[in-house]
Amino acid sequence: MTEAEAAQELARLAGLLAQANLAYHTLDAPEISDADYDALKQRNAEIEARFPHLKRPDSPSEQVGARPGEGFSKVSHAVRMMSLGNAFDDADVADFDRSIRKYLGLDVETALAYTAEPKIDGLSLSLRYEQGVLVQAATRGDGEVGENVTANARTIADIPARIEGAPEVLEVRGEVYMSHADFAALNTRQEAEGGKLFANPRNAAAGSLRQLDAAITRARPLRFFAYSWGELSEPLAETQMQAIERLAGLGFQTNPLTRRCADLDAMIAHYRDIEAQRATLGYDIDGVVYKLDDLGLQARLGFRSTTPRWAIAHKFPAELAWTRLEAIDIQVGRTGALSPVARLTPVTVGGVVVSNATLHNEDYIAGRDSRGQEIRDGKDIRVGDWVQVYRAGDVIPKIADVDLNKRPEGANPFEFPEQCPECGSPAIREEGDAVRRCTGGVICPAQAVEKLKHFVSRAAFDIEGLGAKQVEQFHADGWIREPADIFELRSRYGEGLQQLKNREGWGEKSATNLFQAIDDKRRIPLARLIFALGIRHVGEVGAKDLSLHYRDWDAMAAALDTARLAALAHRAADTAEEQERQQAQAEGRRARISDTRAAVIAAQEVPPEAAAAWADLIGVDGIGATLGLSLSDAFANGDERAAFDRLSAHLTVIPPDAPARDSPVAGKTVVFTGSLEKMTRAEAKARAEALGAKVAGSVSKKTDLLVAGPGAGSKLKTAESLGIETLDEDGWLKLIEGL
């Protein structure tokens, strides 16, 4: 490898690893496997060792985690939260022991004890206690600055709010995780409610901890293992093992498989023991962490730039198996997304029989990622291929590699369908979207079933006795084709009660109860109705924002009708803008974006009332153009609009409570920042809105009041610089007291 090639490869690796860190640590959506990540990092280290003068300022070897997200206030760690070096085999562990002895000047005969503990696959968390009281919880972030998740951490049963007999200042560090059983139960609940399924327990734990609404975190079964510490006002113990035992004595959960190992042989033996138990532990681990037991020697060894010299993670080999890809099936979801699924010759991976694997989208099958870069060295996936399957607690396992040497003669590249396999409608892929979608809408049976499941989910109509299973049965029998049919069941089949009660699994009481439950939902809040429609991009929060803005179903529908021409002009401008950007890039000039948009919109001759209605729609806090276009398309689609109208004829839609107009915050823009100890962020937002305030997510000249809790960061500084009134939580509660 030449210097030029090395520099080019280091730049490529820096970009790949930065994206991987962002996806894993900040977005909670890993894009590559742990094994692939470790391989990239190892290659980067090897090239840097050969060409040290080419080491980049943004070298992955100097990075820990990724920058914190934008949804929480930031916390600076008093003691940096470090990463760990990796060992991939016994020889690496022996090298680790040898390097410690060399650094300390100890020969091979000198006894060195280590602790060995499972490496939990979760999210790192630092808990700060002062005078025995939990005052702050923060994620690792980039090691120096993390996210303040104190309110969420307080909801985790394994995390004590108070501890007795601890140092005045104690930062306890550990891992938030989710057990396999709890993960399966959560996904079952998510599916029944029409919610998003989590890919694996680690993603579920990370996503649950990083909720802006602590009430959501409280409803998720999170656990916590303590294994380390940060800032201390006095030492915990003299050895690592004693310190772990003291943490357990203070009331923290510590891993029962943590052992003190007298020598290298004992470390490897315990690694083998943990590896053998891995499939039966009930939670995910991806290796064993060794730490020098003597804390005095740990202090002498100190740290490298991102890792301690006295600890290392001995990683498990990836759980992999080879099998044959028998078929590729296409499933159609609620929003029309065509999702390919691999049907495999059953194979055991990590103690579990696997017969299906996700293939994500057509790019993944073709050997490309979402940015068009090669994955699997550009190897595509074909029916008949021998594929390498891996799993790490995933709902559906994934394909890691393809053996081209075993590819059957005549195996053809997979042709992703351009028509929906369920209804035959065109399946199109919009610019910038990784997914191809069916355009059939309500005429597509697959979309209809998934939309109906969403409609009856807990966050939508929540009809007792009518869940996903019943929806599938009723749809298959032709009883329910669209939401309006649910409210016609009694009239259509109810002298038909006899028909329903005679079905398998039904009786007179359950049938009567179902009809009553349906009748109970004929009065529905506007926000729930909007969410229940299953319009793409419209979640619970967006539905609530729309309901607060329009306050009436007919008023919202009329506003969308008025705004339609402006919405179409906006889409045409988006298309022209992208074409101009591509053409400018090809011609090596600067794109004239604003001129292009203005010209296209002017050419559409949008009526003023349409422009005003569109501006009003996308100006709703939290809505924007993407959601606005999706909403406009749904109401402009003849079949969908007719279905909406048939449904609304059966309902009495309840407007949201009118916000108070005589409160001290009515008409004001309020921002909350930092930790709130007496209410969740969602409760604070709901209360402020009920009192007539508008709650914003950022501070600007339009902000009237900032409510700042502990850990308030840049928002507080901005408010002070702008002269904006600031209150602490108690001041806010006093302001609204009695209202």
From Swiss-Prot:
User: Record keywords: Magnesium included?
Assistant: yes
The name of this protein is DNA ligase
Q: Which residues lie in Basic and acidic residues bias regions? A: 49-59
Q: Which residues bind NAD(+)?
A: D34, A35, D36, Y37, D38, S83, L84, E117, R140, E175, K291, K315
Q: Write the gene name.
A: ligA
Q: Which Gene3D superfamilies match?
A: 5' to 3' exonuclease, C-terminal subdomain (1.10.150.20), 6.20.10.30, BRCT domain (3.40.50.10190), DNA ligase/mRNA capping enzyme (3.30.470.30), Helix hairpin bin (1.10.287.610), Nucleic acid-binding proteins (2.40.50.140)
The family database entries (PROSITE patterns) matched by this protein are listed as: BRCT, DNA_LIGASE_N1, DNA_LIGASE_N2
UniProt source species:
Ruegeria pomeroyi (strain ATCC 700808 / DSM 15171 / DSS-3)
Active site per UniProt: K119
Please explain the role this protein plays, according to its UniProt record: DNA ligase that catalyzes the formation of phosphodiester linkages between 5'-phosphoryl and 3'-hydroxyl groups in double-stranded DNA using NAD as a coenzyme and as the energy source for the reaction. It is essential for DNA replication and repair of damaged DNA.
